[in-house]
Amino acid sequence: MSLLDELFPGIFNNEWEAIPKWENEDRPWELLSSRESGLISQISDYNEGEAFIHPEAIIGDFVRIEGPCYIGANAEVRHSAFLRKGSWICEGAVVGHSTEVKNSILLPGAKAPHFNYVGDSIIGIDANLGAGAKLSNVRNDRREVFVTLSDGERFGSGLRKFGALIGDNSQLGCNVVTNPGTIIAPGSMIAPNETMGGWVEVKS
């Protein structure tokens, strides 16, 4: 089983209207890189480098959108949200009030609804970030971000900017902070005010 399938099994449901394509399913974070097959390149294929906004998407007042980005059907981008270059907001996902998203994917039904920061990250299907949760994406020393897998293997990601992979149906409590390179297993329940790193699997 690939890491992509382990963390985001729901994406293999062919009913989704539009989700990114992964070249390396064992290193899903590579989609966040600037390579030709990367996220920004794929978004640009939809709308020549500008923002693609589905006619059924809901965009609130005072939202700032910087292309290229993709906003899918029935996605909701609420008042004063900030979508930076490389944001892919899949169908039914929510970007809430004063939330900032940068070079990241919210898979179908994912929610970053209140005062969140999502940097260089992938949030799984129906996963939810509690109010104030932050997915930090850069180490203080600006060096390469490392990842740890479920078997304890640790290695470099090849990226200096990489936030978190949040598995399908995971729930992060209010004010949770993830260190760069955090991987949260699907269905995990993270208590409020926690700082997380490495491989995380917390069941209720």
Question: PLM features: what roles do these ranges have?
Answer:
Residues 36, 65-72, 76-166, 172, ...:
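Flexible, glycine/small-residue-enriched loop-and-beta-strand segment within the central core
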Residues 1-50, 55-56, 182, 186-187, ...:
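Terminal amphipathic alpha-helical/low-complexity segments used for targeting or macromolecular assembly
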